[in-house]
Design a protein with these regions (language model features):
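Hot-dog-fold acyl-thioester-processing enzymes
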Residues: 1-81, 143-148
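HotDog/MaoC-like acyl-thioester-processing domains
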Residues: 1-15, 95-148
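Residues that form or immediately flank small-molecule/cofactor binding pockets and catalytic motifs
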Residues: 21, 92, 110
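Hydrophobic residues in beta-strands and at strand termini
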Residues: 23, 89, 138-140
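Mid-chain, well-packed structural core segment of small domains
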Residues: 74-95
Length: 148
């Protein structure tokens, strides 16, 4: 677990610690079973490739959102909070890819004495394509202030 990061410790333009995720057929199936998503493009190879013309079975897009939540919650620590997350689905995530989830601080500001950080996010596949670009706002604790 990473040490707690504070608002005063970050600067605009800084990249956050990245997270690697390997997409596998097994973790796609486990994810599908938890969210009751039964679209065959996610688990039936012949259907996905022959009937739908896809390169492989594909991970559900909302899996990327969960990767971002894991990335950001790990970065902000116990005293930080994810306040807003927006993502766009641009390219498929397929089994056996190792994805790199990351982000870069684009803005930091104080509002109502709370420290907020805006980030541009990416999930890059092995071809360095940002499959699911995103944006987030997180709240980081401020040094010397008692947190609720």
């Amino acid at each position: 677990m990473q040490d707690q990061i504070f608002f005063e410790d970050v600067i605009e333009g800084q990249e956050i610690t990245s997270l690697e995720k390997k997409v596998t057929t097994v973790n796609i199936l486990m994810y599908l079973s938890t969210v009751w998503l039964l679209d065959r493009i996610h688990f039936d190879y012949p259907f996905a490739t022959q009937r739908r013309g896809l390169p492989n079975v594909v991970a559900p897009g909302n899996m990327a959102g969960d990767y971002y939540v894991e990335l950001l919650n790990g970065w902000v620590g116990e005293k930080g909070d994810l306040r807003k997350l927006a993502i766009q689905f641009r390219s498929f995530m397929v089994p056996d890819e190792i994805l790199v989830c990351g982000g870069k601080i684009t803005k930091k500001y104080i509002d109502a004495d709370k420290g907020y950080v805006e980030l541009d996010l990416w999930i890059k596949n092995p071809d360095n394509i940002n499959c699911v670009p995103g944006k987030a706002v997180v709240e980081l604790p401020r040094k010397g202030r008692k947190e609720a």
